[in-house]
Swiss-Prot record:
Gene of this entry: rpsC
GO cellular component assignments: cytosolic small ribosomal subunit
Gene3D superfamilies noted in UniProt: 3.30.300.20, Ribosomal protein S3, C-terminal domain (3.30.1140.32)
GO BP terms in the entry: translation
Protein's recorded name: Small ribosomal subunit protein uS3
Top-level taxon of origin: Bacteria
PROSITE patterns: KH_TYPE_2, RIBOSOMAL_S3
Signal peptide from the UniProt entry: none
Source organism (scientific name): Rickettsia prowazekii (strain Madrid E)
Length: 217
């Protein structure tokens, strides 16, 4: 089971170590609000694709307000000069949600080499620049262990190196206990748009066992 399902979704729950990316409560309009959250997340990722965003957490504490927490490697790109970019984003979300109370919090990801989303985006960006996929994968693995990662698995699928037949290649180093629910495993995917087609990148990073009686966000 742990080998097939998404490592993040497998560990989401009130008694487990992962949390949802959208936190809201609605009796009748849950579907509408959830679709809104998806559109907001897509908008942020498209506008600031160079900021290497790790996670967008959307909270709705009431019917009149929305709180958006953005974790990114390069927060300055999202903020902009004198806060111009974040003001544009706030106005766009106000027009989309029809809410006047929109709060945006931006957090810098310091240990970005053990953040699966950022690692996957970095590998995809290197593949688009025609860097060898083996070199990109091995560089990511080495950098992960330097920042405290205990295990990492990287997979690339597609026409690797311009080959006519698509294939999948992967590297794994360290531990990767996918069946252990208390294992803190970060998982993410990315796509590299190359001249030969799309190459899919998957990254699993094991950060150790979570032993405290507290949920990991």
């Amino acid at each position: 089971m742990g080998q097939k399902v998404c490592a993040h979704g497998f560990r989401v729950g009130p008694t487990l170590i992962k949390d949802w990316d959208s936190i809201l409560y609605a009796e009748k309009h849950y579907k509408t609000l959830f679709i809104q959250d998806l559109k907001i997340r897509d908008l942020i990722n498209k506008w600031f694709n160079q900021a290497q965003i790790s996670r967008v957490l959307i909270e709705r504490p009431s019917n009149k307000s929305i709180i958006i927490n953005i974790n990114a490697k390069k927060p300055n790109i999202i903020i902009g000069k004198n806060g111009t970019e974040i003001d544009k984003l706030k106005k766009a979300i106000e027009n989309m949600t029809f809410l006047k109370e929109v709060y945006i919090n931006i957090h810098e990801v310091r240990k970005f080499n053990i953040d699966a989303a950022i690692v996957a985006q970095t590998i995809a960006a290197q593949l688009e620049k025609r860097v060898s996929f083996r070199k990109a994968m091995k560089t990511a693995i080495q950098a992960s262990f330097k920042q405290g990662g205990q295990g990492i698995r990287v997979s690339c699928s597609g026409r690797l190196g311009g080959a006519e037949i698509a294939r999948t290649e992967w590297y794994i180093e360290g531990r990767m206990p996918l069946h252990t629910l208390r294992a803190d495993i970060d998982y993410s995917t990315a796509e590299a748009i190359t001249t030969y087609g799309v190459i899919g990148v998957k990254v699993w990073i094991y950060k150790g066992e979570y032993k405290e009686n507290k949920r990991y966000n």
